[in-house]
Amino acid sequence: VDRHDNSPPNGRTVSKEEMEKDVQLMKSLNINAVRTSHYPNNPYFYDLCDRYGIYVLSEANVECHGLMALSNEPSWVKAFTERSENMVRRYKNHPSIVMWSLGNESGNGINFKSAAEAVKKLDNTRPTHYEGNSSYCDVTSSMYPDVQWLESVGKERLQKSQNGETVKPHVVCEYAHAMGNAIGNFKEYWETYERYPALVGGFIWDWVDQSIKMPTPDGSDYYMAFGGDFGDTPNDGNFCTNGVIFSDRT
């Protein structure tokens, strides 16, 4: 599952107790892997994943949504590369980390190639991941593929491996968008994952609804507020409420 830091009373500041509650809930729901979308997490969260046995796809804090142009701008190569390097240096001794992600939805360019090479120099024991371009990474990746496309990828790589060719594993870093009454076709997705060895699984978008605890006008109760509840215009409405569980962890 993909996880953002969110605490209803404290926003992006998540307590140790809330982190542990998240990990315990993941275990109870048979979730075995978490992607730190889209930034490295508090060191204590990695400690918890080590302790409870949760695989981690640790993601660097690199994203330039929108134009996605910075990844091919040479003046930004140091910023891209150093963020991945800092992540690896800080967290490389956590056994829960099984893969490094160079960033999220930032287009494709020379800066990610530089980051991938830098990560390999620091740690050549773990595979690298970036959905925007897998040519310089150890796995290929996709977001929100349909089951038929995923089936075609698995079938093609199975045939190639049977012919003696080397194929990369495929990771679906976001799928089954959990907004409203969603996570459709989950059974079909997992039948496909289990049918083909090259399909190593995927990360549901996302773990928990992001909202802020707000008191009612008379102060007698509270509600979970999101876009538009703060007098903000324009806003994204309920687009941040797309978690597997509610923001109060129920």
Regions found by a protein language model. Name each.
Residues V1-A33, S37-N41:
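An acidic-aromatic substrate-binding cleft motif
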Residues V23-M26, A33-D248:
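Substrate-binding/catalytic cleft of secreted carbohydrate-active enzymes
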